Amino acid sequence: MLLRFTKMHGLGNDFMVLDLVSQHAHIQPKHAKQWGDRHTGIGFDQLLIVEAPNNPEVDFRYRIFNADGSEVEQCGNGARCFARFVLDKRLTAKKRIRVETKSGIIVLDVQNDGQVSVDMGPPRFIPAEIPFVADAQALSYPLEVDGQLHSIAAVSMGNPHAVLRVDDVRTAPVHELGPKIENHPRFPQRVNAGFIQVIDRHRANLRVWERGAGETQACGTGACAAAVAAISQGWMDSPVSLDLPGGRLHIEWAGPGKPVLMTGPAVRVYEGQVRL
C-alpha cells in the first residue's frame, strides 16, 4: 500500500510526518529505520505520527521515532511541525491543540504569523524521573568520561537531557563527547547532550547531540533544557533566545514548577508517497 506523507522541518531539524487519522497502517521501528536513511530512504531526523486520541481530553496522539528506529517520548521541533501539519491537512480547525505524547500532554498554539508556541509542561529535576543515576538531586553533577570530569546539568523535558556549558560552541567537542554522554551508564535510557555558550543574560548559542539521531540542526526539547539549566544556575534570565545551527528559538520559563514555553517556526517542504 502507498502512504501519503509530508516532509517538514523546524530550523533544519527535519521530519517525515504521517497522518494515521485518515490513513490506516501499522508502523514499526523497521519502517522508521528504512525511511530515515538519507542515502536509500526519504531521510529525516525523526518520523512523526499523527493518530486519533484514546484520551477524550486531547485532540491527537503524537508518536515519534528516531531515524535509528527507536521510539522516543518527546520532540519539541516536531511538536511545532505537528501543529502546522494538522491545521494544513484540516484535521482540526483549532489554533490551540492539545496533544498526548508518551511523556504526557502538551499544548500547541499556532500564531497568526506562522510561528508555533509549545507549552512543554514543567521540567523535571528528580534524578529517577530523568532518569539519571545520582545519590541526590543537584543543580549540577560531575560526570566522568574517559577519565575526565565534566560538570553537567541533568533535566527532563519529557525526554532526558544533559547540558554542558562551553566557551565556544564552534569548537566544542560535540561529535567526540556527544555520543559518549549519550550512552553513559548513568543515563539508563541514554540522553541528549546539549552544549551551551552563554552570550549575555538573554542570549546563548547551542548545539545538541540527539539521542538516536546524532547532531541535528536544532532540538526543541534540547533548547528548553539548556534554557532551564542556564536560568537555574543563574547564568541567564527568562526570556532566552537560543541560536542553533538551524536558527533561533525563544524560550520562556518562570521557575521551578512552571511550564516551559518554546516558540519557533514550522515549515512544510514537500508532499510524497511511500510504499509500506
Curated annotation (Swiss-Prot):
Record-linked NCBIfam families: DapF
Name this polypeptide is given: Diaminopimelate epimerase
Native organism: Pseudomonas putida (strain GB-1)
Localization: Cytoplasm
Signal peptide coordinates: none
Cellular component GO terms held in the UniProt record: cytosol
Entry-linked InterPro entries: DAP_epimerase_AS, DAP_epimerase_DapF
Upper lineage: Bacteria, Pseudomonadati, Pseudomonadota, Gammaproteobacteria, Pseudomonadales
The entry's keywords: Amino-acid biosynthesis, Cytoplasm, Isomerase, Lysine biosynthesis
GO biological process, one term: lysine biosynthetic process via diaminopimelate
